[in-house]
Every structure is written in C-alpha cells, then in structure tokens.
Amino acid sequence: MINEDPSSLTDMDNNIDSWKNNSENSSYSHADSLADVSNIDNLLSDKIFSIRDSNSNIYDIYYAYDTNDTNITKYKWTNNINRCIESYLRSQICEDIDFNSDICDKVQRTIIILIRSTNDTNDISDTNDISDTNDTNDTNAIYDPFDISDTNDTNEIYDPFFILDINDTNDTNDIYGIYDPDDIYETNIKDICERYSEIYPRNREKSTFVPIDYSDPNCMEKLARLWVQCETCYGLNFKQFFRPKMNICEHCGEHLKMSSSDRIDLLIDRDTWNPMDEDMVSVDPIKFDSIKELGSEEESSKDRLDEDMLSPDPIELDSEEESSKDRVDSEEEKDQSYIDRLDSYQEKTGLPETVQTGTDQREEIHPLFEDIMNQLDLYLQTAKNRVDSEEEKDQSYIDRLDSYQEKTGLPEAVQTGTGQLNGIPLALAVMDSEFIAGSMGCVVGEKITRLIEYATNLLLPLIIVCASGGARMQEGSLSLMQMAKISSALYNYQINQKLFYVAILTSPTTGGVTASFGMLGDIIIAEPNATIAFAGKRVIEQLLNKEVPEGSQSADLLFDRGLLDAVVPRHLLKEFLTELFQFHGFVPLT
C-alpha cells in the first residue's frame, strides 16, 4: 500500500517472488509489491508512504532518490526497499539509515528513513519472517547495519548518531514532522571512529549533545547525577538502569552499595511492609560536642602555660629601641626580592668580590627560583583551602545527624519492621551505610532490640541485613553497650525460644556489628566480595604499620575458611531465602 496518486498504484501481488528473476533472491519474501515499475518516476520526489506486508504490519517510510540517471529498474527498486524493511525488522526500533546504494551507480544516492511502525510489532509472525532462513541465501540482498565484513563499498556508512530535529517548527510546509529531510547530515567521512564534531559539523548548533568539560571542578558532580562509578573496575553505570539491575555493575558484576529502602523493596513483597519505631531519633547522650569544646579549651590553656614557662627573662632582652629596629629590618627583608636581598647581605657581610655571585649567574638563577617559589605558594594555598574545607565539614554531632537525615531521608541508620517474603511473614532489620557509615548508636541498638523482642513474642523468623562501620564513637561507651544488649535479646530468641535468625552481611560489615549480632546468625549469608572484618583495612595499616593483603577481608575468603554458610548473589537472594525458610518449616500464608 502506497500513499500516492491512485494512478501510480497497480494490482498488488502478495508475493514478491516474481521479482527474483534477476539472479537474486529477495531478503524479505513476504512483503507486498510496492508499485509497478513503469510508474516509478512518480516516486522520485521526496515522499512519505506506507508499506504493508502480508501479516498486515504497516510501516511508514521516507524515500528520496537523488540521481542524475533516472533509469531505475525493478531490480534496484526492490533491493533498496527490501533492505530497508529488513534492517527495520532486525533492529525493532525507530532507526535512521543513510547509505549509498552499492548496486546503483556511484553518482546515485539513496536515502531511506524508517519512521515508525503504525501497529503492534510484537506479532510473532514478524519474528518468524525475520528468522526465515530460506530467504537469506543471498547475503548481498540483506543490509545489516551491524555487519562490518562487507568492505567492497567504502562509501557505505551506517549512521548511529542521528539526532532528531525537534526545534524546526517554523516551516509550515514541513510534512515530515520531526524527521525533517532538510536536516539529514551529508557526510563522506569513511572513518566511523572520527570525532562527533568532525562527523556532524552542519547541525551542531541545533544538536542537543552537550560536551563535558573535564577541567570544570564541578564535572564529577554533574556526572554523578547521571552515572554511578564502580569502585572496582571504575566503569560508569547509567543511573536510570542502575536500580532495576539491583546496583550490580554491568561491566564487572560487582555488588555496589544499596540503600536500606532498596533492600526492603528487594526482599519484601509489595504492600506488605509495616515499619516500626520510625519516630525514634538520636540525641547527644554524652554531650559529645561539649566534651570536645572542653578538651580544646584545656589544650589552649596548657599551650599558653607552656609558652609562659618557656618565655625568656625580660631582663635579658636588648633595649626597646634595638628590638623595634630589628623588627623593622626583618619586615623590610621580607618585602625585598631575591636579588635585592643578595645585594644587601653582601653589603652587610662585606664578602669579597670573588665570593659574591656574578650578575650573569644571578640573572640565570632568578627565573628558576621565582618559578619554584610560585609553585610553593600555589601548593600552600591549595593546602590551606583543603584545611578550610575540612574545617567546614567538622560539624557538631547534632548538625551531622540533621544533615544525614536530610540527605538519606531516614531518621537513623537502620530500618526495622515486619513484612512478607514470598508470602512468609517475618521480622526484618536493614542497616544503611549511607547514614554516618551505618554506625551503631543507642537508637540503632534500641530499634534492633525491640524488633527481636517483637519477633520473639510473635514467633516470627528474623532477618538482619548488616551494613555498618561499627559502634558510633560520638556516643562513647553507650554505643558499645548496644552490642551486649542485642546479643542478650538474640540469646533469648535463639536459645530459649528456638527461633530462626538469618544474618545477611553486606559491604561493609566491620567493628562492633561483626563482633556481636553479625556473626550470631543460625545461617550467615554474605554478598559476593563483601568487606567483612572486625577492624577495617585502614585502621589496621595505621595501627600496625603493615599493609593488609588484598582480599583478606572479602566474603569469598571467609567462606573458604568456613566462617560463612553461603555467598549468594543479590538477584538470587530472595528465592534462596524462600527455600531456606520453607526448609525450616515456615510456609506462606497464602
């Protein structure tokens, strides 16, 4: 079917095999004949028309033929159209194809743009047509945009960077919509690896492509809005697809950090999560900021006392006039340049001429010395700025709590509640390493303890997902006490009530969490390559001044040593837990 003048249409044959007499087989034998070749001149102007195959699949095509020779045969017409259809059905996407016909003369140029499919492309018969091996005997009749083996025609270019013109709305005669043929890029560049700006110099002002300036100090912040960098292979993962892939690097398969909310969505069935103790927030129980200020005041007073004890006796000082003169001389020396200071010291010391540095030598040394001094000044300024930025980050404990609550949207470093895992009711606690490194303070310990007691009373299985740097130092010994409190609640849950507790260790799990409830599970599961240790790598290296071997704190090594029961990839975790609970007698409610 062609949206053209009715006089150009002829009786359609539902089989295009009649055009296969020219020692070539069609690459798509189930398409309808488009037009009688005798009326082909009517289609030489730029037009959009529709084609329909025998399966009632309709496609809109823009076809333009720029040539000095109007002697077009059935063979040329059929081959171009069939290659166009074949390419579309292979890609199954709206894709623009701009190629030089390798069958026509070199002066002829064919432009075919597949605009859209006007019906459902999920028809099974379409895929059957594509996979029909009987129609692919002649590989020359198939245009595959991903096939680079055909190097006979060096002018054939597949254009993967076509940019839609969505700004061209002034032309009232524009019948092509956003696919304006006036904006089709003309290029004879044969190297498809050339830079974007060299391939498309014509429409660069209209392009929505925004180059990235890596010299911009905010460059990485801009990239972080769209990309997540893997900590292992440093590959970039597009944020839009990162969460559906469960925060697993698409390049190396590394399991990157995951928020507590995402883990709840991963494990708990939809609309079954019931959070607990959401209104419980941390305070400053030991007045950590007051102790810090008191300590700084004591240090300053001690320094002042030491200075007073070490200060010289005023009697031993020179006269006030000489001391003021020395101060003036020292200030003048600081303002002098290097050459002037050399001259002044030579005049002051009275050194002979043979010892003094020659004028020529000083002129040669002076630029090098000035350059070194400028570099030192730049380094000192950079260090000063770094110190200033660190001082800005040195917030009080209460301010840090507020900033992390605003950043993560969580009141504390753990979420607790009940839900269903494939229909099995359970109690769940998930720690979040983004909230002050997932550190365990009084509120974290209290929420986990309350959850364990609630699960004990209702005889629910328990899962705790650990992701923590250990006890929170801002709360002192009160944070260390949470280790014993949680362990005591687990003793009653596991030993007295004989209930089932599963610990899931993610990266990082260190410090007091590892030394308490992290390693008390009836079944201990870890994610691949998770960092699990009592003391972190940096702490060990600073304390013992020894380098920690690579991989010595990974979950895979601990599994080999028998400290873990299983290492389960993230995408298999829910099904693994379901089978584990069913094996221990827990059945779904439905």
Swiss-Prot record:
Its EC number is 2.1.3.15. GO terms for biological process: fatty acid biosynthetic process; malonyl-CoA biosynthetic process. Its cofactor is Zn(2+). It catalyses: N(6)-carboxybiotinyl-L-lysyl-[protein] + acetyl-CoA = N(6)-biotinyl-L-lysyl-[protein] + malonyl-CoA. Pathway: Lipid metabolism; malonyl-CoA biosynthesis; malonyl-CoA from acetyl-CoA: step 1/1. Residues 292-357 are annotated as: Disordered. Binds 1 zinc ion per subunit. Residues 308-321 have a biased composition (Acidic residues). It is a peripheral membrane protein. One of its GO terms (cellular component) is acetyl-CoA carboxylase complex. A zinc finger (C4-type) spans 230-252. One of its GO terms (molecular function) is zinc ion binding. Zn(2+) binds at residues 230, 233, 249, 252. InterPro entries: AcCoA_carboxyl_beta (IPR034733), Acetyl_CoA_COase_Trfase_b_su (IPR000438), ClpP/crotonase-like_dom_sf (IPR029045), COA_CT_N (IPR011762). Belongs to the AccD/PCCB family. Component of the acetyl coenzyme A carboxylase (ACC) complex. Biotin carboxylase (BC) catalyzes the carboxylation of biotin on its carrier protein (BCCP) and then the CO(2) group is transferred by the transcarboxylase to acetyl-CoA to form malonyl-CoA. Acetyl-CoA carboxylase is a heterohexamer composed of biotin carboxyl carrier protein, biotin carboxylase and 2 subunits each of ACCase subunit alpha and ACCase plastid-coded subunit beta (accD). PANTHER family: ACETYL-COENZYME A CARBOXYLASE CARBOXYL TRANSFERASE SUBUNIT BETA, CHLOROPLASTIC. This is Acetyl-coenzyme A carboxylase carboxyl transferase subunit beta, chloroplastic. The lineage of its organism: Eukaryota, Viridiplantae, Streptophyta, Embryophyta, Tracheophyta.
